[in-house]
Curated annotation (Swiss-Prot):
Name listed for the protein in its UniProt record: Serine hydroxymethyltransferase 2
Locations listed in the record: Cytoplasm
Any one Gene Ontology cellular component term annotated for this protein: cytosol
Keyword terms, alphabetized: Amino-acid biosynthesis, Cytoplasm, One-carbon metabolism, Pyridoxal phosphate, Transferase
Site (Plays an important role in substrate specificity): H229
InterPro entries, sorted: PyrdxlP-dep_Trfase, PyrdxlP-dep_Trfase_major, PyrdxlP-dep_Trfase_small, Ser_HO-MeTrfase, Ser_HO-MeTrfase-like, Ser_HO-MeTrfase_PLP_BS, SHMT-like_dom
Subunit structure: Homodimer.
Main subcellular location: cytoplasm
One family name in Pfam for this protein: SHMT
Entry EC no(s): 2.1.2.1
GO molecular function: glycine hydroxymethyltransferase activity; pyridoxal phosphate binding
Cytoplasm found in the keyword field: yes
Length: 420
C-alpha cells in the first residue's frame, strides 16, 4: 500500500485549502494594480503542480549529477531555446529561483568582493540588488549610485560623469519604479567609456521588451537578468541571458554550484509554458494594451491634479508623488485597499518620509490588462482612484467604491477554481 495520500487538497488539508480559496476571492473581487504583480495562466500553474516537483536535477541539460533526468533535460532545454528566441540572445540560464538570485549570480560571475558597482539609487527607482546598502549587493561590493534629475528622468550625461568619477567594474541599468523607457544603447556607451560591464536588469519591462514595446537590452548589455513573472506573466522565478559564451560559462558556474543546488524543475517547466505563450502573436497585442492602459492612468491622474514622477509614463506603471500633499503613500495605499484597489506605497525621489511611510504610490496596468480590461475600464478606475485620494479619510465612500468596483471585476473573471 502506498504511503502517499490520494486525497485532493480540499479533503487533505481544509485549512490550507480555505486560505487559498480566500486568496482566489481576493484576486477576483479586488483590482490588482501593483506593478510587479500579474495573473499567470492555468497552464502555467498546472505545470508548476506537475510531477516534476519530485525530481532532483543538479547540473545542466545532459550534464547532470543525478540519473533519470532525460525529461528534466528536455523541458529545461525547451525553456532555454524559447527564451533565446523571445529575446534574440545566444545563451540563457533558466535555473535562478528569483530575480535577486539571478542578480547575485551575475555579480558572483563578474566581480570580486569589494569591486565597484554603479547602480540606480533605490530611493530614485532602483532595486535593492542594484547596490543598496542593506542588500548583499551593497555589502559585498563597493557600491555607488546614480539617480534621476529634478524632472524625474535619468540624465545620461550626468550618469557618464558619475561613471568616470567612480570607475566601476559593472554598471547596472534597470529599475523597479521608473516610468520612462531606459536607453540601453546610451548605457553601453557609458560602460565602454569607463571599461565596465553593462548589466541590464529588465525584470519590470521584460514583457514589453518581448513585444518590441520597449528598447531591447540586446545587443548592448553584456548580461541581462529578468524575473519570469511580472510583465512576463510566468511563474515566480528568474533568468539570466547573454550573447557572450565566456560570460555564459561563468554565469552557469555561479548559479550551480555557486549559489544554488538543485533547480526547481517544475518551475522551469512552467517557465517553458509561459515562454510559449509569449511567442504567440497575441502577446504583442497584450503588451501594447498594457502601455495604452498605463497612459490612461497618466492622463486621468494628471487631469485630476496629481503629480506623477517624470510627468507620466512610457511603460506599464505610473509613480504618484504626494510630496505636496498632507497624506502619505501609506495612507493612500490603505485607503485604496478599502476601496478594493491594491497598489503599493513607494518612495519617490527626494522623499521626506521614511521607507515605511513614503510619499508615493506605484500603480501598474499589467494585471488588469491580463484580465481583459482596456481604456474604458482604466478611465473609470483611474477616476475612482482620484475620488479615493481626494477623500482620503472618507471610509464610507471607500466602501461604496469597493462595491462598485467589485461589480466591474465580475465581468473580467480569469479563474473558476483556486488550484490547477
Amino acid at each position: 500500500m502506498s504511503f502517499i495520500s490520494s486525497k485532493s487538497l480540499e479533503h487533505a488539508d481544509r485549512e490550507v485549502f480555505s486560505i487559498i480559496e480566500g486568496e482566489l476571492k481576493r484576486q477576483t473581487a479586488h483590482l490588482e494594480m501593483i506593478a510587479s504583480e500579474n495573473f499567470t495562466s492555468p497552464a502555467v500553474m498546472e505545470a508548476m503542480g506537475s510531477v516534476f516537483t519530485n525530481k532532483y536535477a543538479e547540473g545542466y541539460p545532459y550534464k547532470r549529477y543525478y540519473g533519470g533526468c532525460e525529461y528534466a533535460d528536455a523541458v529545461e532545454q525547451l525553456a532555454i531555446d524559447r527564451a533565446c528566441e523571445i529575446f534574440g540572445c545566444k545563451f540563457a540560464n533558466v535555473q535562478p529561483h528569483s530575480g535577486s538570485q539571478a542578480n547575485a549570480a551575475v555579480y558572483a560571475a563578474l566581480l570580486k568582493a569589494g569591486d565597484k558597482l554603479l547602480g540606480m539609487d533605490l530611493s530614485h527607482g532602483g532595486h535593492l540588488t542594484h547596490g543598496s546598502k542593506p542588500s548583499f549587493s551593497g555589502q559585498n561590493y563597493s557600491s555607488f549610485t546614480y539617480g534621476v534629475e529634478a524632472d524625474g528622468r535619468m540624465d545620461y550625461d550626468k550618469i557618464l560623469e558619475i561613471a568616470k568619477a567612480v570607475q566601476p567594474k559593472i554598471i547596472v541599468c534597470g529599475a523597479s519604479a521608473y516610468a520612462r523607457e531606459i536607453d540601453f544603447k546610451k548605457f553601453r556607451e557609458i560602460a565602454d567609456a569607463v571599461g565596465a560591464f553593462l548589466f541590464a536588469d529588465i525584470a519590470h519591462v521584460a514583457g514589453l521588451v518581448a513585444a518590441d514595446e520597449h528598447m531591447s537590452p540586446f545587443p548592448h548589455a553584456h548580461v541581462v537578468t529578468t524575473t519570469t513573472h511580472k510583465t512576463l506573466r510566468g511563474p515566480r522565478g528568474g533568468m539570466i541571458m547573454t550573447d557572450d559564451e565566456e560570460i555564459a560559462k561563468k554565469i552557469n558556474s555561479a548559479i550551480f554550484p555557486g549559489i544554488q543546488g538543485g533547480p526547481l524543475v517544475h518551475v522551469i517547466a512552467a517557465k517553458a509554458v509561459a515562454f510559449k505563450e509569449i511567442l504567440d502573436p497575441s502577446w504583442r497585442e497584450y503588451a501594447k494594451q498594457v502601455k495604452a492602459n498605463a497612459k490612461v492612468l497618466e492622463v486621468v491622474l494628471t487631469k485630476r491634479g496629481y503629480d506623477l514622477v517624470s510627468g507620466g509614463t512610457d511603460n506599464h506603471l505610473v509613480l504618484v508623488s504626494f510630496l505636496n500633499r498632507d497624506f502619505s503613500g501609506k495612507d493612500a495605499d490603505a485607503a485604496l485597499e478599502r476601496a478594493g484597489i491594491t497598489v503599493n506605497k513607494n518612495g519617490v525621489p527626494n522623499d521626506t518620509r521614511s521607507p515605511f511611510i513614503t510619499s508615493g504610490i506605484r500603480i501598474g496596468s499589467p494585471a488588469l490588462t491580463a484580465r481583459g480590461m482596456k481604456e474604458a475600464e482604466f478611465e473609470l478606475i483611474a477616476n475612482k482612484i482620484c475620488d479615493v485620494l481626494d477623500n482620503i479619510n472618507d471610509t464610507e465612500l471607500h466602501v461604496k467604491i469597493n462595491k462598485e468596483l467589485e461589480e466591474l471585476a465580475k465581468g473580467f473573471v480569469i479563474y473558476n477554481k483556486s488550484t490547477f
